[in-house]
From Swiss-Prot:
The gene is mmpL9. Belongs to the resistance-nodulation-cell division (RND) (TC 2.A.6) family. MmpL subfamily. This is Probable transport protein MmpL9. The chain crosses the membrane at residues 25-45, 201-223, 225-247, 256-276, 302-322, 335-355, 383-403, 768-788, 796-816, 820-840, 867-887, 895-915. It is a multi-pass membrane protein. It comes from Mycobacterium tuberculosis (strain ATCC 25618 / H37Rv). Its main location: membrane. The keyword Membrane applies. One of its GO terms (biological process) is symbiont-mediated evasion of host immune response. Keywords: Cell membrane, Membrane, Transmembrane, Transmembrane helix, Transport. It holds the Pfam family MMPL. SUPFAM superfamilies: Multidrug efflux transporter AcrB transmembrane domain (SSF82866).
Length: 962
């Protein structure tokens, strides 16, 4: 940075070093080479912003738990292999109707065709089982979830978002339907777009600020116009180099890299130009000629610029030790960019000064003054204690705000409300919960097939346990696809449904009970008939007995008649034979009649035989009729008993039916209560449910093809990208573990991905990264300070004051942004601001301490005064330029960039105006010679008094007017 003091009363003599001599002699070729190099890297590859879009890197590392969870879910479901989620939201002022649904179906069918950008579509609205879960309660909005190619933040993911937006833009929604593309992936894509759009504005504003500051400092248009090309060319070379490396895949980029690299290149280039011009003008002011002034300038500034640049480059390279991809990829491009800026400051800027010096364009226009800073130095050495206490008190303003730091993770709040993604979020917020567009995915994978009633019981148990976690709004699973338990899936309801058939058959049963009364009446009629029959059978029995007796008498009479006729037949047989022998008997009437008489006599014999058979039958009938008569009384008694029993049974069943009806009413009420309450208690899914076509379709959404993995979609009640939302992830994990204890799924693998899970990995990774990167950067800065100052205590003071300045700056940023503006400080700010402030802040302190060391020969206190007088103006100017340059980033559309710039700007202002001006000098004054330990420094002057007075007269500020 600012050079050490040299004896400038005499023009340096002897051979000049080869590097400055070569630069002075070849100034024009060097300028042309830098111009050519800048033009080449600018036209050989696209602009840095375009390369940043194509080489954008993911936010979270591939080995993060959330990344592994999303990849695993995509693998077991054969759906996707990234963590990029986007939402397409449909909104209307009226409830969505059939036209909206047809448009939605057509849009989804069109999205399915783009398989290079869209890996999977979770289409809830089309499936009747899950449709209600994708539509808002007022029916005026619906959404579909897309899994895109590429991880969030990567170029492919951003390209996929643009592809989806193009499809949506080319669709023709019905009148009154508005369609938005939102979600985490769209949010990252819009961040990059916002950062790139703001880059030109930031750059233009930065150069405007620098121009104004240079004009105020030098009061010379010529000097300002000569410094600006140094910065412009150096900036172009730096950006072009990183763009070239990024284009060929040598470094990763992000919108943060592009913005911070540009700001650092402008600020550092301007600072180095101020140091060079200031040293050149100082040499010219004390009477050296232009050539000697050039060599004095280079000899006094080259080592400081090189040390400063290497410190910043080394500190920024420490970001490569981070695990988070966002930080890890920032290290190499920022470090390489700073090396290019340093190279330009050590070659290009001196070449321009050499060319301009030949025409006297950089000669000082007026006498330089140091009285103001000399008075500051005098006050510091006179009252070091009170000044140090006051400085610490000022630092406490920021330090006391640090405990209230609440990092912000939701990038939505760091973009303007009018960005496409925020319009989509706003539309979703009007109809859904605040976290519906940022869901979590819980995956439970086991070695058990869960496509059975037992598996469903465990799945619903997990869903209930997760739902009971504080802050969880709803859980979607196969047992609750719409976020509430399946309808009619409780044991009480199924019991009530079992009795429903009885309720339906109750009227029929009552009709049959009425039939039983009819049957009883009919049985009574039958009984009466049988009693009459008994009386008739009794009479029939008597008649039968008489008929049997008469038949036996007739048989006896007939037998006697046959015997007498037989006697007659025997007597007239010869005569009888004549009638049978006569051939013409039938022609003779008397013969024929007589023959018929004899045939009649033969019939008496037949009649006798038949009467004998009839007599046998009558005897049997006479025997059976009493038996039949004996059967009728028991039958009548039995029928009377049956009738009595039927009437009793009818009365009993009627009472039971009334009781069953009452019981069924209670069961139905209980089932309806469980169904209405949707509590999920007593959940049970019968086996026949698995044959339902809609349920089978739902299983494809929530269960893997082999049935051994189940996923849950979890929505938070509040912002998932918040400290509370992030803390909720471990609670969800613990609830899941508790739910599967002592179940067939015990020991199953649990994965959680999504917004809060991703930011949990980021938060945990940030803690590690800040620790590692911070320690590495502090150690690097301390080593550089130790090598340059060769004093352990001085190096510790430099590092300590820088750390104090860093804490104060961050606290002030928290105070301004979080408490005044009302926007939490983004989680990336700590790491990005720490590195820059460590490097730049230590450089300013190093400059001051180096000047202390040069002037210590005049005595400790006198040396401090002279160092303050000699460096105060130039360091203040450089610090203000750097601070305002970084603060110019506050105009960015991306408020994260604005917070980075304001945090670094506040730190540099505090470091320049308080730490370097009061705190470090007061500490040096208080410690005295111990400040230089282990070096031996005398408190008294060690140079002749004349030389001391001459040195006092030589002290002039390097650039600024007092």
């Amino acid at each position: 940075m600012v050079p050490g003091e040299v004896h400038m009363s005499d023009t340096p003599s002897g051979p000049h070093p080869i590097i400055p001599r070569t630069i002075r002699l070849a100034a024009i070729p060097i300028l042309l080479c830098w111009l050519g190099f800048t033009v080449f890297v600018s036209v050989a590859v696209p602009p840095l912003e375009a390369i940043g879009e194509t080489r954008a890197v993911a936010v979270a590392p591939d080995d993060a738990q959330s990344m592994r969870a999303m990849r695993r879910a995509g693998k077991v479901f054969n759906e996707f292999d990234s963590n990029s989620i986007a939402m397409v939201v449909l909104e209307s002022d009226q409830p969505l109707g059939e036209k909206a649904h047809r448009y939605y179906d057509h849009l989804v069918d069109t999205l399915v065709l783009d398989q290079s950008h869209i890996q999977h579509i979770q289409d809830f609205w089309r499936d009747p089982l899950t449709a209600a879960g994708a539509v808002s309660a007022d029916g005026k909005a619906a959404y579909v979830q897309l899994y895109l190619a590429g991880n969030m933040g990567e170029a492919l993911a951003n390209e996929s978002v643009e592809a989806v937006r193009k499809i949506v833009a080319n669709s023709t929604p019905p009148e009154g339907i508005r369609t938005y593309v939102t979600g985490p992936a769209a949010l990252f894509a819009d961040q990059i777009a916002a950062g790139d759009r703001s880059m030109k504005l930031i750059t233009g504003l930065t150069f405007a600020v620098i121009t104004v500051l240079l004009l105020l400092v030098y009061r010379s248009i010529a000097t300002t116009l000569l410094i600006l090309p140094m910065v412009f060319i150096g900036l172009g070379a730096t950006r072009g180099t990183i763009a070239f490396l990024g284009y060929h895949g040598m470094v990763g980029l992000s919108t943060f890299v592009v913005n911070i690299l540009t700001a650092l290149a402008i600020a550092a280039g301007t600072d180095y130009a101020i140091f060079l011009v200031g040293r050149y003008q100082e040499a010219r002011h004390i009477g050296q000629n232009r050539e000697a002034s050039f060599y004095t300038m280079y000899r006094g500034t080259a080592n400081v610029i090189l040390g400063s640049g290497l410190t910043i480059a080394g500190a920024t390279y420490c970001l490569s030790f981070a695990r988070l991809t966002l930080f890890h990829t920032m290290g190499p491009p920022l470090a390489i960019g700073m090396l290019v800026s340093v190279a330009a400051a050590l070659t290009l800027a001196p070449a321009i000064i050499a060319i301009a010096g030949r025409f006297g364009l950089l000669d000082p226009k007026r006498r330089l003054k140091t009285r103001g800073w000399r008075r500051v130095g005098t006050a510091v050495v006179r009252w070091p204690g009170p000044i140090l206490a006051t400085s610490v008190a000022l630092a406490l303003v920021g330090l006391l705000a640090l405990p209230g730091y609440r990092p912000g993770y939701n990038d939505r709040y760091y973009l303007r409300a009018g960005t496409p993604v925020n319009r989509g979020y706003a539309a979703a917020d009007r109809h859904f919960g605040p976290a519906r567009m940022n869901p979590e995915m819980l995956l439970v994978e086991s070695d058990q097939d869960m496509r059975n009633p037992a598996g469903m019981l465990v799945i619903d148990k997990i869903a209930k346990e997760v739902l009971h976690v504080s802050g969880v709004e709803r859980v979607q699973a196969i047992t609750r696809p719409q976020g509430v338990p399946l309808e009619h899936a409780s044991i009480p309801f199924q019991i009530s449904m079992m009795g429903a058939t009885q309720t339906m058959s109750l009227p029929y049963m009552r009709e049959r009970m009425a039939d039983m009364l009819t049957m009883s009446d009919e049985m009574l009629v039958a009984i009466n008939s049988m009693e009459q029959m008994l009386d008739l059978v009794q009479q029939l029995n008597d008649v039968t007995h008489e008929m049997a007796a008469t038949t036996r008498e007739i048989k006896a009479t007939t037998s006697e008649l046959r015997d007498h006729l037989a006697d007659i037949d025997d007597f007239v047989r010869p005569l009888r034979s004549y009638f049978y022998w006569e051939h013409h008997c039938f022609d003779i009437p008397l013969c024929s009649a007589t023959r018929s008489l004899f045939d009649t006599l033969d019939g008496v014999d037949t009649l006798t035989d038949q009467l004998r058979a009839l007599t046998d039958d009558m005897n049997k009938m006479e025997a059976l009729t009493p038996q039949f008569l004996a059967l009728l009384p028991p039958m009548i008694t039995t029928m009377k008993t049956m009738r009595t029993m039927m009437l009793t049974m009818r009365s009993t069943i009627s009472g039971v039916q009334d009781q069953m009806a009452d019981m069924q009413d209670h069961a139905t009420a209980m089932g309806q209560a469980f169904d209405t309450a949707k509590s999920g208690d007593s959940f049970y899914l019968p086996p026949e449910a698995f044959d339902n076509a809609e349920f089978q379709q739902g299983m494809k959404l929530f269960l893997s093809p082999n049935g051994k993995a189940v996923r849950f979609v979890i929505s938070h009640e509040s912002d998932p990208a918040s400290t509370e939302g992030i803390d909720r992830i471990e609670a969800i994990r613990a609830a899941t573990k508790d739910a599967i204890k002592a179940t067939p799924l015990q020991g199953a693998k649990i994965y959680i991905g999504g917004t809060a899970a991703t930011y949990q990995d980021i938060r945990d990774g940030t803690k590690y990264d800040i620790l590692i990167v911070g320690i590495a950067a502090v150690c690097l800065v301390f080593i550089v300070m130790l090598m340059i100052t060769q004093s352990l205590i001085a190096s510790l003071v430099i590092v300590g004051t820088v750390l104090l300045s860093l804490g104060t700056a961050f606290g002030l940023s928290v105070l301004i942004w979080q408490h005044f503006v009302g926007l939490q400080v983004h989680w990336t700010i700590v790491a990005m601001s720490v590195i820059v402030l460590l490097a730049v802040g230590s450089d300013y302190n190093l400059l001051l301490v180096s000047r202390f060391k040069e002037e210590v020969g005049a005595g400790l206190k006198t040396g401090i005064i002279r160092a303050m007088a000699g460096t105060g103006a130039v360091v203040t100017s450089a610090g203000l330029v750097f601070a305002f340059t970084m603060a110019s980033m506050a105009v960015s559309e991306l408020r994260v960039i604005g917070q980075v710039g304001t945090t670094i700007g506040l730190g540099l202002l505090f470091d320049t105006l308080v730490v370097r001006s009061f705190m470090t000098p007061s500490i040096a004054a208080l410690l005295g010679r111990w400040f230089w330990w282990p070096n031996m420094i005398h408190s008294r002057p060690t140079v002749p008094e004349a030389h001391t007075r001459q040195g006092a007269r030589r002290i002039q500020p390097h650039l600024h007017r007092g």
